[in-house]
């Protein structure tokens, strides 16, 4: 039995969906612990592409329970669309469960999110406009509506009538927007409730019971370490905690019940939206990585900013998350390059810095210090064992592992499940502190 957290080690979009899908075959339960429809993951199975935002990747395995935890925020319309999408492919959704403590994204959240971002002007954050931040803000203000309220008609009507009237003042007076009709919102969300009611449970208790039964549980994070509200490049972050610690808070599971943490990082670096990005390549290399890697957001469709691998970020993610091992994705994107650069440290106003700085302002002053490695001509997409990889590709992976002081357990060479090298069982080994071998 193992309880394992999968986290993003960069700015999100690292390929967590594929890695979680790969590991889900060994899991009895897959749990999503934070975020909302602002994060998307793509899974390719037998040529079929699944693009999901809220439903855990484990839904593709009929014997796996899928739980959406209390740390998430739920857009009922979107999750119903995803249920329809999955069911249309002949996949049962009876194994999907949603925490009654998860908060609900409402129409006014989306309106405020978009209007607020527009109002920021040059100081915009790069929000997806899906209402995530305002939903979490209401959670903190203790004015939010939870899933347990959604499925209670009388409670839902009472909360919506009060909250919509309150939010209308903000919409009209602050943002010059048209007010919402409380009755229309009530009717819309009552319909959502009818569809979602069978899925709403006490998720913390469900997970605890699974742990007592010694079932294998996979905790699936959204976004990445550097988008964490507390530990990311604030204010260019999300409104929740994607780091490993967020899994405990976002599911109601004690930290002593977690056995392992697996990080996921691309063989290069990307980010979406605003904020400092030391290794960003604003030249033909950046364009090449974007084109080869199909670097466009699952949620927004926005082009991702691309650059070389940043080992300073990698070391930080290993430390913050207590990472046991790492999966490196999209190694194949680097095929054919004459040389490959890796950021080993920063130059911060003339001083060498090997540790990630504590603020976005400091990070914006950092310039990458690169180590240049030889590339490889051969294609890696059909490699299924380490021995199949070009020597230079193997050396590259070893170099990354040594820089970050973390073993690499999985290497992904494409979007499909079979395009993967499993170096060692990422759930039961290797142990933290060992290097790539």
Swiss-Prot record:
Residues the entry annotates as binding substrate: 298-304
The protein's UniProt keywords, in alphabetical order, are: Cytoplasm, GTP-binding, Ligase, Magnesium, Metal-binding, Nucleotide-binding, Purine biosynthesis
Biological-process GO terms, alphabetical: 'de novo' AMP biosynthetic process; IMP metabolic process
User: What Gene Ontology cellular component terms go with this record?
Assistant: cytoplasm
Kindly list the places in or outside the cell where this protein is found, as annotated in its UniProt entry.
Cytoplasm
Key word Transport present: no
Active-site annotation? 13, 41
Which cysteine pairs are covalently linked by disulfides here? none
Question: InterPro entries under this entry?
Answer: Adenylosuccin_syn_GTP-bd, Adenylosuccin_syn_Lys_AS, Adenylosuccinate_synth_dom1, Adenylosuccinate_synth_dom2, Adenylosuccinate_synth_dom3, Adenylosuccinate_synthetase, P-loop_NTPase
Cofactor(s) named in the record: Mg(2+)
Free-text comment on the cofactor? Binds 1 Mg(2+) ion per subunit.
- The protein's assembly and partners: Homodimer.
Q: Which protein family is it in?
A: Belongs to the adenylosuccinate synthetase family.
This protein is called Adenylosuccinate synthetase
Provide the species name: Trichodesmium erythraeum (strain IMS101)
Write the gene name: purA
């Amino acid at each position: 039995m193992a309880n394992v957290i999968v986290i993003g080690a960069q700015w999100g979009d690292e390929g967590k969906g594929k890695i979680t899908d790969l590991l889900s075959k060994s899991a009895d339960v897959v749990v999503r612990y934070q975020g909302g429809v602002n994060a998307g993951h793509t899974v390719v199975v037998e040529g079929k592409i699944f693009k999901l935002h809220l439903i855990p990747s484990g839904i593709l395995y009929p014997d796996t329970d899928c739980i959406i935890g209390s740390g998430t925020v739920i857009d009922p319309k979107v999750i119903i669309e995803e249920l329809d999408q999955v069911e249309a492919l002949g996949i049962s959704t009876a194994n999907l469960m949603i925490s009654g403590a998860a908060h609900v994204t409402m129409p006014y959240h989306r309106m405020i999110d978009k209007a607020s971002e527009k109002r920021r002007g040059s100081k915009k954050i790069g929000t997806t406009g899906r209402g995530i931040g305002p939903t979490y803000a209401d959670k903190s203000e203790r004015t939010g509506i939870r899933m347990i309220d959604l499925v209670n008609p009388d409670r839902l009507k009472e909360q919506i009538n009060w909250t919509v009237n309150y939010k209308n003042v903000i919409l009209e007076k602050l943002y010059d927007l048209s007010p919402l009709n409380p009755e229309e919102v009530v009717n819309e969300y009552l319909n959502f409730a009818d569809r979602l009611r069978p899925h709403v449970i006490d998720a913390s208790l469900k997970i605890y019971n699974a742990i007592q039964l010694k079932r294998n549980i996979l905790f699936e994070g959204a976004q990445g370490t550097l988008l964490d509200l507390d530990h990311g490049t604030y204010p260019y972050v999300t409104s929740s905690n994607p780091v490993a610690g967020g899994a405990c808070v976002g599911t109601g599971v004690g930290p002593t019940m977690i056995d392992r943490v697996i990080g996921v990082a691309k063989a290069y670096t990307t980010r979406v939206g605003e904020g400092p990005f030391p290794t960003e390549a604003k030249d033909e290399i950046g364009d090449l990585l974007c084109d080869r890697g199909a670097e466009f957001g699952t949620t927004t469709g926005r082009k991702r900013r691309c650059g070389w691998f940043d080992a300073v970020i990698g070391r930080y993610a290993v430390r913050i998350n207590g990472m046991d091992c790492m999966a490196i994705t999209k190694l194949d994107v680097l095929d054919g390059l004459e040389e490959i650069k890796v950021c080993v440290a920063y130059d911060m106003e003339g001083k060498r810095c090997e540790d990630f700085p504590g603020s976005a302002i400091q990070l914006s002053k950092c310039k990458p210090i690169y180590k240049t490695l030889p590339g490889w001509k051969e294609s890696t997409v059909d490699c299924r064992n380490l021995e199949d990889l070009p020597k230079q590709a193997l050396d590259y992976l070893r170099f990354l592992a040594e820089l970050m002081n973390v073993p690499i357990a999985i290497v992904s060479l494409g979007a499909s499940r079979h395009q993967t090298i499993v170096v060692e069982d990422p759930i039961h080994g290797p142990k933290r502190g060992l290097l790539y071998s």
